[in-house]
Amino acid sequence: IRAHNPEYVLILAGDHIYKMDYGPMIAYHVEHDADMTVGCLDVPIDRAKAFGVMTMDESGRVVRFQEKPEQPDPVPGRDDVALASMGIYVFKTEFLFDQLIQDADETYSDHDFGKDIIPHILESARVMAYPFREASTGRQAYWRDVGTVDSFWRANLELVDITPELNIYDS
């Protein structure tokens, strides 16, 4: 990263299935002058404890973040869903390096974005939530975490459905 000196760094999880143009998320990050932007989506409250769950204010700024909480906070006005992290992050490069260096020195840290870094920076940094939506409809886009054998199996069955929710072909 240092060799190329980018202004921003995009971090992705490797155990998810989705199709996303990252350009609008990066543009949102720049437009809001964020130090960090977290891709997010609504998940049913009963499944939210498997994810990082956040609360944002009316401007889209993340004000609370809990990694895999036992009692996830619901989205205000919608008791059936929580706002979950997709594990997709955009950082200002220097800010990212500063946080990684600081976290590396923390004896009791697991060195995990969701458990350690994000909750630690919320008060001092500008962390924004970016809701993942279909560009054409504005509806929540298809996204599946396939980090377990069961979730991987279910996602595969969805993708071979007669009319799958996600078109994996570019046509």
Residue spans for each PLM region:
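Unchanged
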Residues: 1-160
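Long, charged amphipathic helices and adjacent flexible linkers at domain junctions
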Residues: 162-171
